[in-house]
Structures are given as structure tokens and as C-alpha cells.
Amino acid sequence: MDPRKVNELRAFVKMCKQDPSVLHTEEMRFLREWVESMGGKVPPATQKAKSEENTKEEKPDSKKVEEDLKADEPSSEESDLEIDKEGVIEPDTDAPQEMGDENAEITEEMMDQANDKKVAAIEALNDGELQKAIDLFTDAIKLNPRLAILYAKRASVFVKLQKPNAAIRDCDRAIEINPDSAQPYKWRGKAHRLLGHWEEAAHDLALACKLDYDEDASAMLKEVQPKAQKIAEHRRKYERKREEREIKERIERVKKAREEHERAQREEEARRQSGAQYGSFPGGFPGGMPGNLPGGMPGMGGGMPGMAGMPGLNEILSDPEVLAAMQDPEVMVAFQDVAQNPANMSKYQSNPKVMNLISKLSAKFGGQA
């Protein structure tokens, strides 16, 4: 199984333990049912969650949710991590040192000369002449640029000169040439320690000791390893927090999508009901309506094909009182009743709303008859 999915599941379970109300959301119903079907018991929702179920659910403020999520996340993973930085120095910014031409053709004479330069460089190093040692190792590298130990030796001098970035460049080159040599890892680990790169330092020093145990490298590994472990634990902590935050965000997105869908359904249902309310009138007005309304009005509202071409129809429908009456269920029920049987109009003689609409229609159509 994908380890990331396992971590996400672990983070979700932890979140559920901290806040069981998460399991009582509608989208988590399937999980509750499964747990109960297996004989398990879902913890009761918090009082807050129960009260929300008994009242109208308030829509979440997305901005507030985002602010809460951001508040949970520090500005950086190490913002609240305290590490002793004794011995850490500012990085060196010198131009890259000479590395020699790795494609150069090397003769035996050049190799002998390079070896002589190396011996002289080691003597200068033992005498404390560090810059002279650097220059001599550089001469040796230019003569034999494919010898890993020359880069490792020069890196050791750069570390003594407190130029960790230069040392790292030399060690990288040495490892490219011979990845099984312990010396480049040892000096690169020491360089990373000078820069406060605790995890990188621990990795390189551990590998150096694995390839060829060295007491000096082992002693420094014991110093940096606790700091590297502390950083790793801190990172895992915030990875779990990020995973929990991602789960919360996904739940929030599902919740918002469901609310949008439900709102769209409600709006569609309202439109359907509105269309049915103002739909076609059954049977038209057979035989004509009293008050000189022309007979045979085969439809109104959403299905008014018989009235579509009537002169003055737009004028009638633009009359606010007519529109208001057509939105009154009581008036429309009476209107349909009279449409089916004009004799029933007598029942509504005392209803001013119904008679007002009939009078307006009668006056309009009567005037154009």
C-alpha cells in the first residue's frame, strides 16, 4: 500500500480521536455504518456537534477556515525548533576553485609530478602553511584531475580554513570519481557541520564510518546526530499536521460541494413549482367568459400558445397588478375554476382580488373584441 496513503489514514484516525464529531458529518456516514457493522462503537459527537444537528446548519465561512488553517502552520518548519548552533559559521562565498580538466590526457610523467606536489602539500599542511598546501594540491589536481584523494585532501584544508562550501565542492568531485572512498564523506560531513546542516552532516559522517571507521568522524557523528534526529522528528510532526490539514480541507470541499448541489436542487425545485403554478390553464375558456372575455383562451402562463399573438398581451403582462394577481395562489385557483366553468364566477363575486383580475382582462379583451 502507498506509504503516503497510510500516513494520511493515520493522520485522519488521530484527528477523529481528538474530535469524534468529524465522524458524525453526513459525508462520514458510510464510515460510521461500516464501524458499527463490524461490531465497533462510534464515539458520541461533542455537544457542539449535537447542537448543530438540532439547529439549522450554518454555512462555514471559507475565509475563516483558511485563516484557521494558516494559523496552524508556522512560517517555517524550524520556526519553533531550537538547535544549539555553537560552531556554525557563515558560508564562504569565494569563486569556485580550479578543478582541472577531467578530459585531459594524463601521462606517467604528469602522474609522477602530481604525486610530488601532493607530498609537498602534505608537508606544508603539517607545517601549518594552509594556503601553500591549497596551492600545491591545486597544482597536483591540474596534473592528475582524475585522482579522488587529491580533492579529498584539498577539502580537508578548506575545512581547516573554514571554507565549507569550497570543501563540499571538492568532496562532491571526489565522490563522483570514487563513491566508495570514506575520506570525501568525512570531510563533506565536517563541512556541513560548519554550516549547521545537521542532517546532511550526520548522513555523510555515518557513511564515512561505515566505509572505513574513523574515530574523528565517529566523534563528530555523536555530536551532530541528536540534532539531526530532533530536526527529523520535528519535520515528521509538521508532515502529520499538514496531512491532517489536507484531510480537513478535503472534508470542507466535499461539504461545500454538497451544499452547492443541495442549493441548486432547491432552486430547480422552486423553478418547477413556479412553472407549474403559472402553467397552462386546463380547458381554456369554453364559450367565452362573462364580461366580454373572448372564448377559447387555450393557455396562459408558461404554456400560453393561444395568447402569444393576442394584441395587447404584452401590455397586460406588464401591468404590475395583473402580475401580482397571477402570483397569488388563491386568485389563480379561482381563475382556473372559472376557466373550466364560467358559471362558477358567481362564487367569487365577493372576492375583490379575483374580480379585479377578471375586470382588467375583460376590459382589455373587451375593448379589442
Swiss-Prot record:
Keyword Lipid metabolism attributed: no
Subcellular location: Cytoplasm
PROSITE patterns, sorted: TPR (PS50005), TPR_REGION (PS50293)
UniProt biased composition (Gly residues): 281-302
Region listing for Disordered, in residue ranges: 38-97, 256-302
Main localisation: cytoplasm
Sequence ranges assigned to domain STI1 in this UniProt record: 319-358
Top-level taxon of the source organism: Eukaryota
Main function: One HIP oligomer binds the ATPase domains of at least two HSC70 molecules dependent on activation of the HSC70 ATPase by HSP40. Stabilizes the ADP state of HSC70 that has a high affinity for substrate protein. Through its own chaperone activity, it may contribute to the interaction of HSC70 with various target proteins.
Subunit structure: Homotetramer. Interacts with HSC70 as well as DNAJ homologs and HSP90. Interacts (via the C-terminus 303- 319 AA) with GRK5.
Name assigned to this protein: Hsc70-interacting protein
Organism lineage: Eukaryota, Metazoa, Chordata, Craniata, Vertebrata
Gene name in the database record: ST13
